């Protein structure tokens, strides 16, 4: 039986604590904590022990459950989520406004529905006519297996989900829903967590297993808004990353109980919706002849896949006291560090030069293995000497200018050889060069040695 207990709730943010205070510790507002009586659903450990029987077992005797995965028509989505949507799983998708969360989920709804799954799309932010207008634009022919419900009531959503016997449920977004049994305002931490708990219960019901995908808002710092508890509740956390001015969208799993984390799916935002990038090389690498300064190529690891990345740099004379350092694809601190190494270890004087770098396709530089390519592209622009477009650079560069080896260098070199590159500059490492018949591998000690070799002609 549920017990009653006294608590104090912030009427501004919904924070609950056992003792009164003048200031809410969560939102910082004064005089907002009010006393209320709430139900304590937790029972004593003695009562819990009567509800079910359980005992410790030997680990080697535990049987593995086989996850039933639901494949979509989007290989990039299935890759990011670990091979397909697990039937009794709860996933949350977060992204900045305008990144394409609702578009992606509507496209997935159509894909699953065409394969015979009953899909319930519950929106707490848009009307049914708004969803229909977008569906007509990006889906075209709408399957009879897609159900739409526009409501903020989790109680009503539960009724309709059960009535329509939905296999896959999409909630857009979880922060807009509420349960009638709680007095907290819509969007408060309590309502959000309890609505998420309701989704978990519906998904993992033994009588009818369902897959849930919830949308979660993202705050200004690029993290999912709300309590961390929400991330702990769900099985999978997906982040759709991309700037509104760029077409590129990266779908990354930051948590996955049913597969590897860090897997990445690549999409391009077009007028007809999100389009899979099937061949990343064509998307990220510009087709050009040798003879253009300021360009260098490397390979970067995103999840389990290797992506070619082209770095473009522009070095120009500055007539201001403080030269510009601009790097949309790279953190400014990292760019300044690499410029300092170039100046001190390679004799490339950039103290009065503007330096601008960019990765083609809008790809963000997340790996140190691209350091060498960035520095070579800057040197190429400064020296007004081009780099051969069949040459690649893979190495982390230390503060001493020394080239350091990068993880999985063998697989990177194999991929580059497959793509038709002829020469690769890397740090000193123990590899058998005979394994690469069509790729010349040049092991170098430091950045000065690389610059001397590349631009000696």
Model-derived features with residue positions:
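Peripheral, non-AAA+ core regions of ATP-driven protein-machinery
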Residues: 2-5, 9-12, 16-79, 86-94, ...
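Conserved RecA-like ASCE P-loop NTPase motor core of nucleic-acid helicases/translocases
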Residues: 119-123
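Conserved Walker A/P-loop ATP-binding site and its immediately adjacent core
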Residues: 124-130
């Amino acid at each position: 039986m549920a017990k009653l207990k006294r608590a104090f709730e912030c009427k501004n943010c919904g924070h609950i604590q056992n003792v009164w205070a003048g200031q809410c510790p969560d939102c910082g507002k004064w005089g907002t904590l009010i006393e209320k009586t709430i139900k304590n659903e937790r029972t004593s450990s003695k009562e819990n022990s009567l509800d079910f029987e359980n005992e410790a077992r030997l680990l080697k005797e535990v049987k593995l459950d086989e996850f039933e995965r639901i494949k979509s028509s989007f290989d990039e989505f299935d890759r990011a989520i670990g091979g397909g949507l697990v039937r009794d799983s709860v996933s949350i998708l977060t992204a900045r406004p305008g990144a394409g969360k609702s578009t992606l989920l509507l496209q997935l709804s159509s894909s699953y529905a065409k394969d015979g799954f009953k899909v319930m799309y519950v929106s707490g932010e848009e009307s049914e006519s708004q969803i229909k207008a977008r569906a007509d634009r990006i889906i075209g022919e709408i399957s009879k297996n897609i159900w739409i419900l526009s409501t903020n009531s989790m109680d009503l959503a539960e009724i309709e989900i059960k009535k329509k016997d939905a296999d896959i449920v999409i909630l857009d977004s979880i922060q807009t829903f509420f349960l009638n049994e709680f007095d907290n305002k819509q969007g408060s931490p309590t309502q959000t967590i309890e609505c998420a708990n309701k989704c978990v219960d519906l998904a993992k019901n033994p009588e009818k297993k369902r897959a849930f995908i919830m949308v979660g808002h993202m705050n200004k710092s690029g993290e999912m808004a709300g309590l961390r508890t929400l991330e702990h509740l769900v099985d999978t956390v997906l982040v759709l990353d991309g700037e509104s001015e760029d077409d590129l969208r990266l779908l990354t799993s930051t948590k996955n109980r049913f597969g590897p984390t860090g897997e990445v799916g690549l999409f391009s935002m077009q007028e007809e919706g999100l389009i899979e990038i099937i061949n990343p090389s064509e998307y990220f690498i510009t087709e050009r002849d040798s003879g253009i300064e300021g360009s260098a190529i490397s390979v970067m690891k995103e999840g389990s896949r290797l992506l070619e990345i082209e770095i473009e740099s522009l070095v120009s004379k500055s007539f201001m006291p403080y030269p510009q350092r601009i790097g949309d694809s790279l953190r400014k601190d990292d760019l300044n560090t690499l410029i300092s190494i170039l100046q001190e270890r390679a004799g490339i004087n950039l103290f009065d030069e503007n330096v601008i770098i960019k990765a083609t396709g809008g790809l963000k530089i997340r790996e140190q293995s691209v350091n060498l390519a960035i520095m070579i592209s800057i040197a190429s622009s400064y020296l007004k000497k081009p780099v051969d477009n069949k040459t690649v650079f893979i190495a982390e560069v230390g503060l001493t200018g020394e080239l350091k080896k990068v993880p999985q260098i063998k697989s990177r070199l194999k991929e580059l050889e497959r793509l038709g590159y002829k020469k690769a500059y890397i740090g000193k490492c123990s590899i058998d060069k005979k394994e690469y018949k069509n790729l010349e591998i040049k092991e170098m000690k430091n950045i000065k040695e690389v610059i001397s070799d590349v631009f000696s002609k």
